[in-house]
Regions:
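Acidic, Ser/Thr- and proline-rich intrinsically disordered linker/docking segments
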Residues: 2-62
Length: 62
């Protein structure tokens, strides 16, 4: 199932196949703000959605 998130860098909507998500975590930027990172089998995606929203969407399809 595809999940849609907003890419933090481009502000574009990005589709991510839930089957390929490995882990979701938060990381601090250079300015100290926290961003949510989705790690997939092909790389990382930094998104603008809150951590609990991302995890909630992922849990809904599992």
């Amino acid at each position: 199932m595809m999940l849609y998130f907003t890419d933090a860098q481009t502000q574009q909507s990005v589709a991510v196949n839930a089957e390929y998500i490995v882990v979701v975590f938060t990381a601090k930027n250079e300015d100290g703000s926290e961003k949510v990172v989705i790690n997939t089998t092909t790389g990382n995606l930094v998104v603008t959605e809150p951590y609990l929203d991302v995890v909630g969407r992922l849990n809904a399809v599992q």
